Amino acid sequence: MAKPTYVKMDFPQELQDKALEALELARDTGKIRKGTNEVTKAIERGVAQLVIVGEDVTPEEIVAHIPALSDEKKIPYVFVKKQQELGAASGLEVGCATSAIVDAGKAKALVDEITQKFSALKA
């Protein structure tokens, strides 16, 4: 399957795994937002610390605005291969197009590490 048009760079599997781990930890010890509408609001309000987006979302238009909006607000984001994994990490039994960490809780160190790696990828 070809990469969706909104995925502008490749994210290493290690970074994807760390992002999902951080999301699970933040879900249990901090606060997260699930779903494209909630994540969009969190980005616009500047409260999102890390945004995680599924690459296999259809139609693409559902999440196509997330990377540009995140760049505009200088919020790091990571793409993961499957929205089913993202849903599971978010505490859902179904897939989830996007999730955001709003309060990292005990995942702060992981979020900081992911942010540094994201900055290096963007450079």
From Swiss-Prot:
Assigned protein family: Belongs to the eukaryotic ribosomal protein eL8 family.
Source organism superkingdom: Archaea
Name of this protein: Large ribosomal subunit protein eL8
NCBIfam families named in the record: eL8_ribo
Gene3D superfamilies xrefs: 3.30.1330.30
Cellular component GO terms held in the UniProt record: cytoplasm; ribonucleoprotein complex; ribosome
Broad class of where this protein is predominantly found: cytoplasm
Native organism: Methanocella arvoryzae (strain DSM 22066 / NBRC 105507 / MRE50)
